[in-house]
């Protein structure tokens, strides 16, 4: 007598990637069910409509594939474990990445636990563009096959024990192939555009949205030479390397080169700007990272040659990583890097393998400044 098929719960977002993931798993012989997560309760009309449309699309796909769709509300977990931390980081003048926190706390913790305990799942699956490889009894996290869509940067906090319970069917495909499959199946999500914006909160006017939760604190904009060139509405609205939205042009005698944010003086509420995107004040020779997560969950000591990304879609930067203590590492780049931003994540790679990463605590500026 053959064993009954393994049960997989697919996180259905109402998008094309999770839709095709569900179908691929059916083809592979799994018993597939879907789960739609509602994680945001602060409903304004616009967001409510978006969530309702996503749920309707997820339901339509599940109906088409003949699978059951469960719904669950993780809004309390999202607020407590993701959103409040997100606001705290902005308040402290740093630029957090909510998608990384959301994957850690919601998709691969709350969802994983709910699927296993309440729905009796053997695995969960998501539409992330990553792959897993099982080596020597541990699961590794690999970049997605489609380099342009690879999302391993957002999943570096996962441990091998979470990866072993997770399946990533579209990680083995290129995005155009995924859309083609959806079109061939006549799925409602086939031509739906990819979502952007904050994880689960969606696409909003960011300044307006943040202003609802954090009071604006206007302050001076000064140049690296100390000249007063304008006023900002709050350091939280600005990030290192930012060019747009500063509201300052070229100076009278000076160059017409665009201005970039090169520093945030949180103590004095001052935004520091300079002209040119490779201004020395914007360049770093390295960084200190904390809150480390290694995929293999082994403590890191000594030094390591690898590559690092300090933001999503960045070209890999060759570097040397040195353990400072259990919680912190120093990263030295082979060449200076622009706009290394505290609060963002530094994610380490060895070839295709995502080793893990940490939060950028501080950047190490170019010594010549």
From Swiss-Prot:
Residues 149-151, 311-312 are annotated as: Interaction with tRNA. It is an enzyme of class 2 (transferase). It is found in: Cytoplasm. It catalyses: S-sulfanyl-L-cysteinyl-[protein] + uridine(34) in tRNA + AH2 + ATP = 2-thiouridine(34) in tRNA + L-cysteinyl-[protein] + A + AMP + diphosphate + H(+). PANTHER family: MITOCHONDRIAL TRNA-SPECIFIC 2-THIOURIDYLASE 1, TRNA 5-METHYLAMINOMETHYL-2-THIOURIDYLATE -METHYLTRANSFERASE. CDD domains: MnmA_TRMU-like. ATP binds at residues 11-18, 37, 127. Residues 97-99 are annotated as: Interaction with target base in tRNA. Catalyzes the 2-thiolation of uridine at the wobble position (U34) of tRNA(Lys), tRNA(Glu) and tRNA(Gln), leading to the formation of s(2)U34, the first step of tRNA-mnm(5)s(2)U34 synthesis. Sulfur is provided by IscS, via a sulfur-relay system. Binds ATP and its substrate tRNAs. Disulfide bonds join 102-199. This is tRNA-specific 2-thiouridylase MnmA. The keyword Transferase applies. The gene is mnmA. It comes from Enterobacter sp. (strain 638).
């Amino acid at each position: 007598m053959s064993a009954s098929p393994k049960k997989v719960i697919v996180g259905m977002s109402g998008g094309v990637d999770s839709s095709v993931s569900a179908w691929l798993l059916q083809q592979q012989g799994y018993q597939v069910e879907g789960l739609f997560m509602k994680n945001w309760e602060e409903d304004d009309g616009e967001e409510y409509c978006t969530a309702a449309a996503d749920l309707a699309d997820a339901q339509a796909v599940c109906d088409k594939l003949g699978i059951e769709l469960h719904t669950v509300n993780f809004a309390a977990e999202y607020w407590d474990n993701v959103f409040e931390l997100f606001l705290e980081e902005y308040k402290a003048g740093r630029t957090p990445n909510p998608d990384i926190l959301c994957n850690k706390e919601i998709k691969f913790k709350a969802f994983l636990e709910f699927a296993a305990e309440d729905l009796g799942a053997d695995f969960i699956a998501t539409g992330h563009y990553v792959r897993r490889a099982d080596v020597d009894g541990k699961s590794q996290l690999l970049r997605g096959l489609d380099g342009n869509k690879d999302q391993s940067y957002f999943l570096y906090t996962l441990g091998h024990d979470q990866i072993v319970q997770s399946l990533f069917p579209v990680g083995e495909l290129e995005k155009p192939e995924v859309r083609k499959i959806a079109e061939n199946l006549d799925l409602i999500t086939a031509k739906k555009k990819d979502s952007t914006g904050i994880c689960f909160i969606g696409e909003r006017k960011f300044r307006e949205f943040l202003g609802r939760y954090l009071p604006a604190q206007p302050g001076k904009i000064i140049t690296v030479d100390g000249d007063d060139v304008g006023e900002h509405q709050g350091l939280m609205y600005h990030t290192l390397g930012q060019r747009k939205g500063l509201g300052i042009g070229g100076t009278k005698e000076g160059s017409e080169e665009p201005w970039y944010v090169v520093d945030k003086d949180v103590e004095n509420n001052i935004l520091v700007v300079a002209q040119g995107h490779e201004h020395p004040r914007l360049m770093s020779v390295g960084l200190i990272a904390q809150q480390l997560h290694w995929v293999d969950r082994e403590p890191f000591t000594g030094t390591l040659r690898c590559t690092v990304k300090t933001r999503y879609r960045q070209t890999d930067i060759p570097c040397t990583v040195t353990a400072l203590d259990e919680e912190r590492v120093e990263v030295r780049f082979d060449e200076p890097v622009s706009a290394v931003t505290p609060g963002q994540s530094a994610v380490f790679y060895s070839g295709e393998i995502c080793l893990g990463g940490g939060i950028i605590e501080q950047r190490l500026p170019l010594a010549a400044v």
